[in-house]
A protein has these predicted regions:
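FIC/Doc superfamily catalytic core
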Residues: 1-283
């Protein structure tokens, strides 16, 4: 099996943006609805809305990876990193500190240019309670990075990422692509396209020993709210978790080719459904 990064013209993704035409009116409507609702809220209620969405994202992005935290632990972690005073509960699971901190970092830095240092810092922030991996640095070693499922002896290899020696250049190119793909907030089609490619591109590189899925979803969120130029409440992981099997099937398919029209259509629908979820949560 040949993977996307093994093609000579990697990472020149091919796609037809015409498939998004039927989604654009709906996407624009949801953006307008949420903006209107947020603007009608008091500052305190706006902050609470963002907080609740950050909690949902932290809980669900962790659940996708098989880690389960209480909303109370996540809320206390986020509030501490936002310097919100009050009676904060003791955080029982220290890993909740990491994912809560990451949610805050995404929002604090959403307007900043993406850098490798930022991505490494996010990884260190997320995984600081993990004693078994190297945090904040790219993976090294000769063993292939493979996405595997199945019982021992009957493993199925879904994907094999680029070798570790290729990671520094791959990440340099990824960050360069991200920053050069500039999107006007009114260019809603390219907001969907860039966010979809951003997630796929990073997941295909898989630069860290662990935590790649969570960092990849964090990057998709940053890409989305940075492109809109506002910290829009959204929880992509809530919708990915609900459609987990389909998500992994589509990701696997997209990582076998540079033709990613189906992936962009699928992930764009995830974004729009995440907007609907945010709206329902607010109202």
């Amino acid at each position: 099996m040949k993977y996307n990064w093994q093609y000579s013209d990697w990472a020149k993704f091919n796609y037809s943006d015409s498939v998004l035409e039927s989604l654009l009116i709906e996407f624009a409507f949801e953006i307008g609805e949420i903006k209107g609702i947020i603007q009608s809220l008091s500052n305190e209620n706006q902050q609470d809305t963002i907080l609740q969405m950050m909690i949902s994202e932290a809980v669900k992005t962790s659940e996708i990876e098989g880690e389960f935290f209480s909303r109370q632990d996540i809320m206390s972690s986020i509030k501490r990193h936002l310097d919100i005073s009050g009676n904060l509960a003791y955080i029982r699971d220290k890993k909740a500190l990491g994912v809560g901190s990451l949610m805050v970092e995404i929002r604090k830095s959403y307007q900043k240019e993406l850098t490798e240092e930022m991505i490494k810092f996010w990884h260190e922030t997320l995984m600081k309670a993990n004693l078994y991996i190297n945090v904040g640095v790219y993976r090294t070693g000769k063993e292939p990075m493979q996405i595997i499922s199945g019982a021992f002896g009957k493993e199925i290899i879904h994907y094999e990422a680029p070798p570790s020696e290729a990671i520094p250049l791959e990440m340099k190119n990824f960050v360069k692509w991200y920053n050069e793909f500039r999107v006007n907030p009114s260019d809603i089609k390219n907001i969907l396209i860039k966010t979809s490619i951003c997630h796929l591109y990073f997941e295909s590189i898989h630069p860290f020993e662990d935590g790649n899925g969570r960092i990849g979803r964090a990057l998709a969120e940053k890409c989305f709210i940075q492109s809109l130029n506002m910290p829009m409440p959204i929880s992509l992981s809530s919708i990915i978790k609900k459609n987990k099997k389909e998500y992994y099937n589509e990701l696997k398919k997209a990582q076998q080719s540079l033709e990613i029209t189906d992936w962009i259509l699928f992930f764009s629908k995830i974004i729009i459904e995440a907007q609907r979820f945010a709206k329902q949560t607010i109202v």
